[in-house]
Amino acid sequence: MYKEFGIKEEVISLAEKINKDLLPIFDEIDKNCELNSLKVLKAFNKYNVSDMHFNSTTGYGYGDVGRDTIENIFSEVLGAEDSLVRGQFISGTHALTVALFAFLRPNDTMLSICGKPYDTLDEVIGIVDNDSSLKSYGVKYEQIDLINDDFDYDKIIDRVSKNDIKLIEIQRSRGYALRRSITLDKIEKVIKAIRSVNKNVIIMIDNCYGEFVDKVEPLALGADVMVGSLIKNLGGGIAPNGAYIAGKKELVKLAAERLTAPGLGKEVGPTMGINKYILQGLFMAPSVVASSLKTAIF
C-alpha cells in the first residue's frame, strides 16, 4: 500500500517498531484522552446541548443562549468559577492582553517567573516600547528566568514575599524559546511555594497549547485564572477563531468588562454563527490533542 507513495519497506518496518516501543506512552495519552472526553461529554449532558445552541446572533448579542451555554460548559470542563469564551478575541495574545489590562492598574507590578513571555507580548508589556503598552500606563514589569527548565524557587519566594507584586504570569508552553514546556507538577509546586508567602497575588497561567495535555488544568492546582486560544487545543481544529479567559468569577468579570465595556461585560457579544463550531471543536479537542501528542512524540 505504501509503495505507490514512495515509502520504503525499511521505513515502514522502523515506524512499526517505534510504534510498539511507544505503546506505554501512547496508552497513557489515550487514558488522558478518554478522561477529558468524558469531562466534555458530561458537561454537554449537564447543559443539555442541542441544535438550539447553534443559533446565531448579531447586533449586541443580548440573550445569546448558545454563547452562555458554551461558557458554562467551558467552566465545567476547565474547573473554573466562570469563563469568557468569545469569537471577539482575535488570538491568544489578544486574550492575554485583555486579561493583563483588566487585572493591572498604574503602579502595579507584573512578574513573569518563566523568563520573558512570547515575543508577541513584548509591546503589550512594554519590553519593546509602544505608546499603548502596560508600561505606558505605569504598570511595572519584572521577570525571573528559569533554571534548567525549572523555576528559580528561592528567588521567586524572596521576591513574592515582599507583597508588592499584583500579578504573576506563568507561560506553560515553550513559545518561541528553546526551553521545555512547564509540566503541571512544577506548576503545582511553584504555586504552593508562592501561596506559602503570599495569599493575595493573582496567579495567571498562559495555557496556550496546554489544554487536555494532562488530566487536569492549572486551575485545579491553585491558579486564579488562565487564558488560551481556540485556534489551538480547545478549538479542535474546527473553531474558526476565538479565545477564552477562565477562572475566578471576579477576574472573569473584569476581563469581560475590558473586552466589551464597564456595565456590559458578558451580557453582550454576538456570536455570528460560530457557536456550532466552538462546540464541535471542544467535543473533538481531546482526540485532536491526543493525536497531536502522539505525532510529536513519534
Task: Annotate each language-model stretch with its function.
Residues 67:
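N-terminal pre-P-loop "Q-motif" helix
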